[in-house]
Amino acid sequence: MPLAKRIIPCLDVCNGRVVKGTKFVDIKDAGDPVEVAKRYDFECADEITFLDITASIEGRDTMIHMVEAIAEQVFIPLTVGGGIRKAVDVRAMLNAGADKVAINSAAIFNPNLINQLSEEFGSQCIVIAIDAKKVSDNKWEIFTHGGRKSTGIDAIEWAVKMTKGDNGAGEVLLTSMDCDGVKTGFDLLLTKAASDAVDVPIIASGGVGNLEHLSEGVLQGGADAVLAASIFHFGEYTIQQAKQAMQENGIEVRL
């Protein structure tokens, strides 16, 4: 029996509110993080991802009190990212109730960080988050600090490097900056290139505008999980509608 594919609503949090932008800018308010998370828990989302989108830019820690508040109210796996730079940050997030932590910018500055964290905490709770922008045909580059800083690093090569070996990251959260918030679907070439290249689950992110896009991420992109925000935040679709649509397309999901 194939493993069920996961639907993961994403809470981008800025100044204590859930927000959603387009291509990492043009931010709109989408509600209180705890209330939004409770709704997704009630709707039977498979997981929730909480990203403090300005923590790395502002050089501060993730909003731990909000992670604690969400973890008290939801009973599905919670991934937390933003401003996590070292082992003490990971421990604080796990103690606050997170099940997994997503590392993005910090891994660029310390490429050994993922291995160190996976060895200490287990690869199952370490996610490498990659924000990728297309720079030419079949080539994507990593950007950091909320998509503001170019690194010159090839996104697919980085995904391979960060997941190889026993102490690599256990998952890849792969966001297309070109597609983010545009609602035209995932960058399927990017998603497929990554899923073909690594041996750990790929979470496709960036671009979902309708339910069909979720299925495309799995069937064409090879994703193990699909992440979306605005189609759920603003009430266009429910999690159950999304799962039913994926099931109708022959995808195994947990209803």
Curated annotation (Swiss-Prot):
Pathway: Amino-acid biosynthesis; L-histidine biosynthesis; L-histidine from 5-phospho-alpha-D-ribose 1-diphosphate: step 5/9. It is found in: Cytoplasm. Disulfide bonds: none annotated. SUPFAM superfamilies: Ribulose-phoshate binding barrel (SSF51366). It is an enzyme of class 4 (lyase). It catalyses: 5-[(5-phospho-1-deoxy-D-ribulos-1-ylimino)methylamino]-1-(5-phospho-beta-D-ribosyl)imidazole-4-carboxamide + L-glutamine = D-erythro-1-(imidazol-4-yl)glycerol 3-phosphate + 5-amino-1-(5-phospho-beta-D-ribosyl)imidazole-4-carboxamide + L-glutamate + H(+). GO terms for molecular function: imidazoleglycerol-phosphate synthase activity; lyase activity. HAMAP family: HisF. IGPS catalyzes the conversion of PRFAR and glutamine to IGP, AICAR and glutamate. The HisF subunit catalyzes the cyclization activity that produces IGP and AICAR from PRFAR using the ammonia provided by the HisH subunit. This is Imidazole glycerol phosphate synthase subunit HisF. The gene is hisF.
